[in-house]
Structures are given as C-alpha cells and as structure tokens.
Amino acid sequence: MVRLTDSEKAEVVSLWSKVDEKIIGSEALGRLLVIYPWTRRFFEHFGDLSTADAILKNPRVQAHGEKVLSSFGEGLNHLDNLRGTFAQLSELHCDELHVDPENFRLLGNILVVVLARHYGKEFTLEVQAACQKFVAGMANALAHKYH
C-alpha cells in the first residue's frame, strides 16, 4: 500500500484543484490507447480508434477519460482508504472486464506525463514525486481484487 505524507497530499490536492478533468482525462486516456495499442481492445465499441488523431478526437474516448479522471479526483478524498473506496471498481475491472492490472500503472504514468506537460513550472520534483505515489496508490487499489 502507498502512503502519502501530509506534505505530499497537499502537493497533489493543490495541483488537482487546477486540473480540468475533461482535458487532462481525455488526453491521458487517448495517449494510453495510442502508446499501448493493445489497450484498445477494451474500447472497440467506442468507434474509430484506427489512428492517433481519431483516438484523440473520439468523443467517447474524451468522455471516458473525463470519467476516469473524475475517479482519480474522488480518490483524493479517500487517500487513506483507496482500496476500500475503489473495491467495486476493482472488482468490475477484474471479474467482468478482465482488464490487465498493469494497464492501471501505465495509465497512471501517462497521467503524470500529461500533468507535467500542462503544468510545466508548477510541476516541481516534489509535485511529481507526490503524483507518482498517488497514481501508484490508485493503480494498487484498482488492481487489489486481482490478488
């Protein structure tokens, strides 16, 4: 389990207060689908995913990216109980969707890249370290039912 210090929690919460979940979520999920094309199999019903441009402009990818990032935002309200908070979502991804839990780690790492790209100078080493711990905690919580 990943534990953030009070300082790390403050860093992530402060950055997140500036995050536009639609923009950041859409880009993060889009990048996941482009960079790791095997992840597209979970989204085939979203329509055209044939090119990077098609993926990044796909309204269903954008909407789901926003939904995913909203869940990450919800995680900030439950940093001390991510596993409990996301138990049902973990179960869904494990038992029904059969998502490879490694995909959660990949998405988290892409999210950190997207945040760095959008928040530049504000994305200090301390903020990055805190964000990496946060996304690792989220990935761990979402993969919990697989263990």
From Swiss-Prot:
One of its GO terms (molecular function) is haptoglobin binding. CDD domains: Hb-beta-like. Pfam families: Globin. The keyword Iron applies. It comes from the Eukaryota. Keywords: Heme, Iron, Metal-binding, Oxygen transport, Transport. The keyword Ubl conjugation does not apply. Residues 3-147 form the Globin domain. Red blood cells. GO terms for cellular component: blood microparticle; haptoglobin-hemoglobin complex; hemoglobin complex. InterPro entries: Globin, Globin-like_sf, Globin/Proto, Hemoglobin_b, Hemoglobin_oxygen_transport. Heme b binds at residues 64, 93. GO terms for biological process: hydrogen peroxide catabolic process. Heterotetramer of two delta chains and two alpha chains. PANTHER family: HEMOGLOBIN FAMILY MEMBER, HEMOGLOBIN SUBUNIT BETA. Belongs to the globin family. This is Hemoglobin subunit deltaH. The lineage of its organism: Eukaryota, Metazoa, Chordata, Craniata, Vertebrata.
